[in-house]
Design a protein with these regions (language model features):
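Radical SAM enzyme [4Fe-4S]-AdoMet core and its adjacent flexible, acidic
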Residues: 100-113, 120, 124-229, 235, ...
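Generic recognition of stable, solvent-exposed alpha-helical segments in well-folded globular domains
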Residues: 28, 61, 76, 114-117, ...
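Flexible mid-to-C-terminal extensions adjoining Fe-S/redox cofactors in radical SAM and related proteins
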Residues: 249-341
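Radical SAM/AdoMet-radical enzyme domain recognition
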Residues: 2-18, 25-163
Length: 341
């Protein structure tokens, strides 16, 4: 994977390691990753490494490695991350009580205290990390408590990811499922908290809000769901199988295998299945919405097909309408302030 992508890359290339749990491969695997990146980087390409983890195995060695190689967790892991400049996404789902109700070991033991220790280690070793929080019903209902708790921990880089129902299952039937009205209220409450801190110059970085403000300033958002169009990426399984997105790792979307196919063959298959093109098929009601210029229809994974029109509409459409109606004026105020600086 590294050899083929390095030979083709221009300017920069990004490798993101997710799971399962990627730290189960051990530090030796990631040391080999860094070695290969150096070996095949013949043209001074900028390499960005990222790793998403539950933090359970992070120690000092890991933290140091991640910091140096731009990754991000125990002391051994931390040393590795710091040394190799890994950017880490650390999964934390709210306060201890909420987190442990969902994220526990296979024998039911809590994990929160160990994850918080991993965050402390990464901070100590200078590892860059973001907090990744899945927004389920409990998180959405307790966001004020969670926001204040994160501030006390010094967790100032945050991403909130709406909890998804399993693909091809009906929406809202699982106990953790996030319903549109609930998600809309969550976004409004979180923005109110963020905006109050922004007025004081003490706001955390919340990617979703920062991207919206960037859109209003004329910048392309970094998150593909906020662009409304799927990007071109290769998600690779351990056996080399390639898919267009980590939400669509199914046989119907398989693009090929890195052990058997060239990158141009993988790209041809992507075009054949029309994956990126399908993200452009938005319902007319969506395209004419007053908020389309900032919403862009959201992530393809959250869209439902309208059988009558053959186009798609986002399940969380009403959530975003609630949010923008309540918060867009203050976003525009923020933009005016930034433009004056």
């Amino acid at each position: 994977v590294i050899r083929k992508t390095m030979l083709r890359a221009e300017g920069a290339v990004s490798y993101a390691f997710q799971g399962g749990e990627p730290t189960l491969r051990g530090i030796d695997f990631f040391e080999k990753v860094v070695e290969f990146e150096k070996q095949y980087n013949k043209h001074g390409i900028r390499v960005n490494n990222a790793l998403q983890t539950n933090g359970y195995l992070i120690n000092e060695e890991w933290a140091a490695f991640l910091g140096e190689n731009h990754f991000l967790i125990n002391e051994a892991w931390c040393e590795f991350f710091q040394k190799n400049h890994f950017l880490i996404g650390l999964s934390v789902d709210g306060t201890k009580e909420i987190h442990d109700s969902y994220r526990h070991t296979k024998d039911g033991k809590p994990t929160f205290d160990r994850i918080r220790h991993a965050a402390e280690l990464m901070s100590h070793y200078g590892v860059e990390y973001n907090i990744l929080t899945v927004v389920n019903q409990k998180v959405a209902s307790n966001i004020t408590e969670i926001y204040e708790f994160y501030k006390k921990q010094g967790w100032n880089y945050q991403q909130y990811i709406a909890c998804l129902d399993p693909l091809e299952e009906a929406h809202g039937e699982n106990e953790y499922a996030l319903k549109p009205e609930q998600y809309g209220k969550f976004l409004i409450e979180l923005f109110n908290l963020w905006y109050a801190d922004w007025k004081l110059g003490k706001q955390p970085y919340i990617r979703q809000f920062e991207n919206y403000i960037g859109i209003l300033l004329g910048y392309l958002p970094e998150a593909c769901d906020q662009r409304g169009t799927c990007g071109v990426q290769n998600v690779v399984e351990a056996d080399g199988s390639v898919y267009p997105c980590d939400f669509y790792m199914l046989d119907d979307y398989k693009l090929g295998n890195f052990n058997e196919n060239r990158l141009d063959e993988i790209d041809t298959k992507r075009t054949e299945i029309g994956f990126v093109e399908r993200s452009l098929l938005l319902d007319e009601e969506c395209k004419t919405c007053e908020y389309f210029h900032i919403c862009h229809g959201g992530c393809q994974r959250n869209r439902d097909l309208n059988e009558l029109t053959g186009k798609y509409q986002n399940y969380f459409c009403e959530s975003y309408k609630m949010f923008f109606a309540a918060c867009l004026p203050r976003m525009k105020e923020t933009v005016k302030t930034l433009e004056k600086r």
